Amino acid sequence: LNIHLTGLQDEEFHSRPAMKGLHVYHESGVWRTDWPETEEYEIGPPSISWLTWHITYWWSMVLDHSFGSGTLTREEVLSMGNIQETRDRINRLKDEWEREVAGLPGEALLSMERTRWPFEDRPFHELLAWLNIELMKNAAEIGYYRFLYAVSKK
């Protein structure tokens, strides 16, 4: 992920790959995000600002539901509105995630005790794998759009 966020500036961060697609918007002093009702291709491609919010959303929700109070909702996970604060937030979440997971005894990975969101009744190691896939998918999408953005500016 860091390779795709390095050198990223706010102009590219807020650019849209298409007129239609998931994005963030500033409303009443708060950066809010679109939320898809479907994952069909017709919704359009997401912007980098939306993808980075999506990363903070997944990590924040899983951290809260696996290691915290379990009360955090999607609406409470707001976009930061700029790339520097977003990078800082992603790094804080990464550090917190590594600290929490590293502190678990091995048997906790086989337990279902911490698997509370977005699914239950599965060993915690399956949640770890699922989260890694989601984060890497978002990172790949950011990288792909950065290629498109770079050639469009030439």
Give short role names for the model-derived ranges.
Residues 78-110, 126-136:
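Acidic/histidine-rich alpha-helical segments that form the ligand environment
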